[in-house]
A protein has these predicted regions:
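N-terminal Rossmann-like NAD(P) cofactor-binding subdomain of oxidoreductases
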Residues: 1-132
Length: 132
């Protein structure tokens, strides 16, 4: 049985694209034949070229950084969130339901909110999302 190959790339957005993890995601996703990187959020660097922040990515064709407020949620299939823990949950609650999210922080790593608050020493504000 042959696998059906999707000719349309998966539209990827990264939130938190100006840190180390964001840079690695940009590098890896831009090389993947099934992915198209179309938005990279870095609020403090919005409007700047990714290649100006990460010179080692100069050879890649990349979008400029945008702010979270500039995100077009109609133009995304999957979001990678590369923000620090406790920052991630503040942003993820603002993303429309139905969009797939891979969060690389600790915010949704543990099943029970009590465990998160005990381990990380901060309140978890996204209780409804934790249940998903």
């Amino acid at each position: 049985m042959s696998k059906k190959i999707n000719k349309n790339p998966v539209l990827i957005s990264i939130i938190g694209g100006s840190g180390y993890t964001g840079a690695e995601l940009i590098r890896l996703i831009s090389k993947h034949s099934y992915f198209q990187l179309n938005q990279v959020v870095a609020n403090r660097n919005a409007g700047k070229k990714i290649q100006d922040i990460f010179p080692h990515l100069r050879h890649l064709k990349l979008p400029d950084f945008i702010s979270f407020k500039q995100m077009n949620f109609d133009n995304v299939d999957l979001i990678f969130c590369a923000l620090p823990h406790s920052t991630s949950q503040e942003i993820i609650v603002k993303i429309p339901k139905g969009i797939k999210i891979i969060d690389l922080s600790a915010d949704f790593r543990l099943e029970r909110i009590e465990e998160y608050e005990r381990w990380y020493g901060s309140k978890h504000i996204a209780h409804s999302l934790q249940e998903e």
